[in-house]
């Protein structure tokens, strides 16, 4: 498959390797990376379902914290690795070609302050058509992991009161909240994203805290349809 080196949207000096045809990073990854709240106390971050490392690369512009990332598909992992090396971020970002169910084989006992995830959105049983391209199929459909797998990995590898950030489809928000509660990752904040002023939200960003009290804050819907940058989009939200 032919590769291309692109600008990582408007993040100056960041480049990312992608395939000319097929897998590319999405706006969802940018929104997730921007949504993450990082403090001076943040020591380490884990990114699940990392793709070609768009989320870790963007997060690296906001912190010096160490970032580990896991990507199950070898071809996509290689793109992520090349992007990290090209941007000279090997000292900060480490990517593993592994299933998130096997994190303990690589980082046994390590607990993270923050975990992020831009997962496959679609259940296999609900899908009328699954892409013939295996890479795209695995990236978009729950062929290798489920929501339970994701929340299990997050709760197992988060420090107490650590934060988990997830981007997903609005249509699965009820399932997300139920699953989060099951794994003691109570949802604290919800952001709803739409692309038209009078349109319905299609994306949801959630922030969970491990072993926290119940109570959810839902911020005003954000229309991103005409935005030229997504930097500081969530700056006023808490």
Predicted regions and their residues:
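N-terminal auxiliary segments of SAM/dcSAM-dependent transferases
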Residues: 1-4
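SAM-dependent Rossmann-like transferase core, predominantly class I methyltransferases
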Residues: 7-44, 50-62, 204-207, 221
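Short, structurally constrained coil/turn elements
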Residues: 10, 89, 181-184
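A structural micro-motif
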Residues: 14, 43, 65, 91-93, ...
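Conserved Class I SAM-dependent methyltransferase catalytic core
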Residues: 15, 21, 144-201
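Conserved SAM/SAH cofactor-binding pocket of Class I
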Residues: 34-108, 114-128, 152
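Mobile active-site "lid"/loop adjacent to the S-adenosyl-L-methionine
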Residues: 121-149
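SAM/dcSAM-binding transferase cores
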Residues: 197-238
């Amino acid at each position: 498959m032919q590769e291309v080196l692109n600008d990582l949207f408007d993040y100056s000096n960041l480049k990312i390797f992608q395939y000319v045809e097929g897998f590319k990073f999405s706006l969802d990854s940018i929104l997730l990376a921007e949504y993450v709240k990082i403090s001076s106390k943040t020591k380490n971050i884990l990114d699940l379902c990392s793709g070609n490392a768009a989320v870790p690369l963007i997060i690296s512009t906001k912190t010096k914290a160490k970032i580990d990332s896991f990507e199950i598909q070898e071809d996509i992992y290689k793109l992520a690795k090349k992007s990290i090396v090209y941007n000279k971020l090997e000292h900060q970002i480490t990517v593993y070609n592994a299933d998130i169910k096997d994190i303990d084989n690589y980082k046994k006992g390590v607990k993270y302050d923050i975990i992020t995830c831009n997962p496959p959105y679609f259940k296999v049983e609900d899908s009328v058509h699954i892409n013939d391209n295996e890479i795209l199929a695995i990236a978009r459909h729950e062929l290798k992991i489920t929501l339970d797998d994701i929340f299990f990995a997050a709760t197992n590898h988060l420090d107490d009161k650590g934060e988990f950030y997830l981007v997903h489809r609005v249509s699965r928000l009820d399932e997300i909240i139920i699953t989060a509660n099951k794994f003691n990752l109570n949802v604290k904040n919800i952001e709803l994203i739409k692309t038209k002023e009078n349109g319905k939200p299609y994306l949801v960003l959630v922030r969970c805290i491990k072993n926290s009290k119940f109570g959810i804050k839902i911020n005003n819907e954000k229309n991103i349809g005409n935005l030229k940058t997504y930097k500081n989009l969530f700056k006023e939200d808490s």
